[in-house]
């Protein structure tokens, strides 16, 4: 890694989860002569873990760890190295995301070493690589003025019909993208690191309250349910119906007013009973699901890694924010209260317990009886996102009439 970054000032560590990306990047910074101030950008929940690694390594340079959402709070200049954790989150296309623009600006103003970290550099499309690196001088795509010119050479652009309009699809990136990145990348797998762990998954079926099932049936039939003047559940499009059923089958709902409510704590009650005496990590999808867990678990539940690691409390994390950059090595089991539509979320979140010394991991999925979760699961285990197309195919019931959506 030191040879690559000394030569090119840029290194991409494509290392699988739990193989030591953080310590490797901090160690590389220690070996570079001209590095005194390092900026480490990550997700908020990973900050404490990275600071612990820094203290353990005890290098000669100063380290500032910050989350992407707080980049506006730090000095724009004075950094000798910038490390971007979970770099694939910079990869939105065709337009660059706000965070990709912010990182580009920081790199430009500091002319510094850059290290990108990710266990999944291009989780959904090779095209995601461009905006991860476009702000780094000397990157392999610097000859292209923008993403569209990059696509002229590296992407097979197609047309997709969406809502009656022909939209250009830039997701079919070519193998040439990864070929171009090879000289900047170091890849390292769990197998290479000596991991021999396995993950066993078990699906647990949870009966929901009768009123919850009836509410779902009413919504599929009528596409609107008015509980009170203020509490209206509207599902007048396919996307809305998919989202509302996803919420309801796990016992929560977000009303048209923007307010949310817990209508059924069956899943939370089941978790408390099933895993009594065990220390667990719980992943939830919707914010109201955390409210349901708090109602049932009370003070026995925390939401930060530091408390989880130092007490006997369980931890609850939202799937998207907790799937990357953290380790739940102290959990006996991981329990999914709900499931995300994203295949990336599935593959990353289920791996949070894995360590080199741990040979066996058990992950539990809670699916409501008759709910939508098992249908989503079938898609994501095949590395496919669950989309409206899947939903319309799956929910063909007498109450649901797709022609109305």
Where do the protein language model's features map onto the residues?
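Walker B catalytic acidic pair
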Residues: 85-86
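Conserved Walker A/P-loop ATP-binding site and its immediately adjacent core
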Residues: 19-27, 34-54, 123-128, 286-287
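Inter-Walker segment of RecA-like/P-loop motor cores
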Residues: 43, 57-73
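SF2 helicase motor core recognition
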Residues: 15, 22, 71-76, 118, ...
């Amino acid at each position: 890694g030191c040879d690559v970054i000394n030569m090119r000032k840029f290194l991409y560590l494509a290392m699988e989860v739990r193989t030591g990306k953080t310590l490797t990047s901090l160690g590389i910074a220690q070996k570079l002569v001209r590095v005194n101030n390092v900026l480490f950008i990550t997700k908020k929940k990973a900050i404490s873990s990275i600071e612990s690694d820094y203290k353990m390594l005890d290098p000669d340079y100063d380290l500032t760890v910050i989350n992407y959402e707080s980049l506006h709070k730090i000095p724009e200049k004075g950094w000798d190295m910038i490390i971007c954790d979970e770099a694939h989150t910079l990869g939105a296309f065709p337009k660059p995301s706000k965070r990709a623009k912010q990182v580009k600006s920081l790199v430009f103003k500091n002319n510094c070493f850059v290290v990108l970290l990710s266990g999944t550099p291009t989780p959904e499309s090779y095209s995601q690589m461009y905006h991860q690196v476009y702000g780094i001088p000397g990157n392999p795509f610097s000859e292209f003025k923008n993403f569209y010119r990059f696509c002229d050479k590296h992407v097979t652009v197609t047309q997709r019909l969406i809502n009656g309009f022909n939209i250009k699809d830039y997701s079919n990136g070519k193998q040439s993208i990864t070929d171009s990145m090879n000289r900047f990348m170091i890849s390292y797998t769990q197998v290479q690191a000596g991991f021999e762990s396995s993950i066993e998954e078990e699906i647990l079926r949870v009966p929901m309250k009768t009123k919850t099932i009836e509410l779902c049936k009413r919504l599929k039939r009528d596409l609107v349910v008015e509980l009170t003047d203020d509490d209206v559940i509207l599902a007048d499009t396919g996307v809305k119906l998919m989202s509302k059923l996803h919420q309801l089958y796990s016992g929560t709902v977000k009303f048209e007013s923007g307010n949310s409510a817990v209508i059924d704590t069956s899943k939370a009650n089941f978790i408390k009973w099933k895993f009594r005496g065990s220390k667990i990590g719980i992943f939830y999808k919707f914010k109201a699901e955390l409210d349901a867990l708090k109602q049932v678990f009370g003070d026995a539940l925390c939401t930060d890694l530091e408390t989880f690691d130092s007490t006997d409390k369980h931890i609850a994390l939202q799937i998207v924010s907790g799937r990357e950059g953290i380790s739940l090595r102290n959990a006996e089991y991981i329990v999914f209260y709900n499931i995300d539509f994203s295949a990336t979320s599935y593959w990353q979140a289920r791996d949070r317990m894995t360590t080199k010394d741990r040979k066996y991991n058990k992950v539990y999925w809670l699916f409501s009886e008759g709910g939508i979760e098992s249908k989503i699961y079938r898609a994501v285990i095949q590395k496919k996102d669950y989309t409206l197309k899947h939903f319309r195919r799956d929910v063909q019931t007498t109450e649901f009439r797709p022609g109305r959506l």
